[in-house]
Amino acid sequence: MGIPDIRAILFDKDGTLFDFHRTWMPGYRTIAAEVSRGDAALAARMLAATGLDPITGKLDPVSALAAGSNSEIASLWAAVADVGAAEAIAERLDSWFGAPGAIIPVPVTDLAGLLGRLKTRGLRLGVATMDSHAAAIRSANEFAFHHHLDFIVGHDSGHGHKPGPGMMTAFCASVGIEPRHVAVVGDTPHDMGMARSGGAGLAIGVLTGASPRFELEALADHVLDSIGNLEVALGLA
């Protein structure tokens, strides 16, 4: 298909700006082991209940681990572990991932360089994540691209959750650009669902997250190996 008149780009964070598996799975395994009190079989069941295939090690792209919030993960883990303390688990997830040095984000490319070039082209840029708003800001500051962003929204920002249109609608309202001029870039069907429900001009899938190519190809206008190929895909390189 041809490239529409794109004036803004809304990026997912984990699996799109950052390699999902290398960044997040070590932490989820650590907290699952903690909640299960070292019971490896129980920890495996908890991870499986939230989307991790115990045989292949792959994630279900629409699972809680791949596309949900810490609250969703905690509710499922509490049910499997029969501990009845979902709020406490969610708080532990938030505090663990929010602690300095707890995770080592692995960017898929030079984020400051890429977003800086896109900004120089006059594009408005945003991040919509199922992580918290505060965590998204920390990542943007840590990798020196916060000043290139016009908008950041998290699952706790009050604009709903993917695949609903709320996050995208809020982005469009914030930057004053109609949805048909927006490209949404993400790694899961939920990201593509947000693009479609929000009326985005382009839905672009990337393979640095939980979803295989065939799954994204059924939903996206384009599927890229990573956002490192985005400028070429948009005709900007």
What are these regions (language model features)?
Residues 16, 129-131:
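Conserved phosphate-coupling serine/threonine residues in phosphotransfer and NTP-handling enzymes
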